[in-house]
Each structure stands twice: as C-alpha cells, then as structure tokens.
A protein has these predicted regions:
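Class I SAM-dependent transferase core
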Residues: 1-37, 71-74, 78
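A generic "cationic amphipathic patch" detector
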Residues: 37, 49-52, 63, 72
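Conserved S-adenosyl-L-methionine
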Residues: 40
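Conserved SAM-binding loop of SAM-dependent methyltransferases across substrates and taxa
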Residues: 43-55
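Short beta-strand element of Class I
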Residues: 56-60
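S-adenosyl-L-methionine
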Residues: 62-83
C-alpha cells in the first residue's frame, strides 16, 4: 500500500520522501513474512509503509531521538501497525 507523505505525522526530524520509500521498499523484495530492522528510523515512514506489504512479518524500528520514537508510535498507531 502506497502512503503519501502528507498522511504521516511529521516533525523537524527528516522523513524519507515517498518516491525514495517506493524504490527502497521495492528493492528489498519483501515477502509477507519478512522481518525488517529499520536502524535510524526517524519518523518511521519506511518501516510503516514496508509493514503494509508484510502482513505476517515484523518491523523493528530503532531510533535514538526521543521525539522520533514518539512520532514513530503516532504514525504506527495511525496506520494500525503498532504491536
């Protein structure tokens, strides 16, 4: 499922733009049960969009900035990808 930039909650942290997410996710060749580790997850856009292609998979988002963690949680909840 493609997610547009404007659909994500954004902060001053950098966000991977939708065109870059689309190419990156396509190159990962994810399977429905893949496991993705997103190091330096920022606002969580790559992991959250990737999760839409992995219904039985898992995404682990790692981010050192507290504001980033809060934003990842908001975005994950918004797209029902938080467990």
């Amino acid at each position: 499922m493609h997610i547009y930039d404007k659909e994500f909650t954004q902060t001053e942290l950098p966000m991977t733009k939708q065109e870059i997410r689309a190419v990156s996710i396509a190159k990962l060749m994810l399977k429905p049960n893949s496991i993705l580790i997103d190091v330096g997850a920022g606002t969580g856009t790559i992991g959250i969009e990737a999760a839409t292609y992995m219904p039985q998979g898992k995404v682990y988002a790692i981010e050192k900035e507290e504001k980033g963690l809060d934003t990842i949680k908001l975005n994950a909840e918004k797209f029902n990808k938080f467990r």
